């Protein structure tokens, strides 16, 4: 305990010295000037009713689309302006190959053709199926039933019967 009390609680260095009188006077003068300027500005505001710059009636170009008043996000960054600008930028950036001139040759575009087996398939020929639209219901049910029966053989259905031995 005695050793702790002998040491000062806080050491001071040269950098921590209080400011000289001259510099302190300068600080005070700047403070007074700043306060006077603020008072003059407040009196100079429209009709003298507003207390600060942020409350001004006329804030320069706030009616313009680009700004939303003092300290706010620009309107360009808000909502649908942002979306619209992105959309326009996208349209400008679409390369010309995506707007091909239909009368000229489309360079780089290959003719897409179906394989011959697919072309011969009746599904791809709409004329063959126009009169024969409805499939026979019994045929469909038989096909469906066989698929259902196959499913019933395995899976959870066997487990369910063993889960409740009393029933």
From Swiss-Prot:
Region (Disordered) location: 1-75, 144-167
Compartments where found: Host nucleus, Host nucleolus; Host cytoplasm
GO MF terms, alphabetically ordered: RNA binding
Chain intervals with Polar residues compositional bias: 158-167
Compositional bias annotation for Basic and acidic residues: 1-20
Keywords, comma-separated and alphabetical: Coiled coil, Host cytoplasm, Host nucleus, mRNA transport, RNA-binding, Transport
Quaternary structure annotation from Swiss-Prot or TrEMBL: Homomultimer; when bound to the RRE. Multimeric assembly is essential for activity.
Note on domains (UniProt): The RNA-binding motif binds to the RRE present in incompletely spliced viral pre-mRNAs. This region also contains the NLS which mediates nuclear localization. These overlapping functions prevent Rev bound to RRE from undesirable return to the nucleus. When Rev binds the RRE, the NLS becomes masked while the NES remains accessible.
Protein name: Protein Rev
Source organism (scientific name): Maedi visna virus (strain KV1772) (MVV)
Species lineage: Viruses, Riboviria, Pararnavirae, Artverviricota, Revtraviricetes
């Amino acid at each position: 305990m005695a050793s702790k009390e002998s040491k000062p609680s806080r050491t001071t260095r040269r950098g921590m010295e209080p400011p000289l009188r001259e510099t302190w006077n300068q600080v005070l003068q700047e403070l007074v000037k700043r306060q006077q300027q603020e008072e003059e500005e407040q009196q100079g505001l429209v009709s003298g009713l507003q207390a600060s710059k942020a409350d001004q009636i006329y804030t320069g170009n706030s009616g313009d689309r680009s700004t939303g008043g003092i300290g706010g996000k620009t309107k360009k960054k808000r909502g649908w302006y942002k979306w619209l600008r992105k959309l326009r930028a996208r349209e400008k950036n679409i390369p010309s190959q995506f707007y091909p001139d239909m009368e000229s040759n489309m360079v780089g575009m290959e003719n897409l053709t179906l394989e011959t087996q697919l072309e011969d398939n009746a599904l791809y020929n709409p004329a063959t199926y126009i009169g024969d639209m409805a499939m026979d219901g019994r045929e469909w049910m038989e096909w469906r039933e066989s698929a259902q029966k196959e499913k019933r053989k395995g899976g959870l259905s066997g487990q369910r019967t063993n889960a409740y031995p009393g029933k």
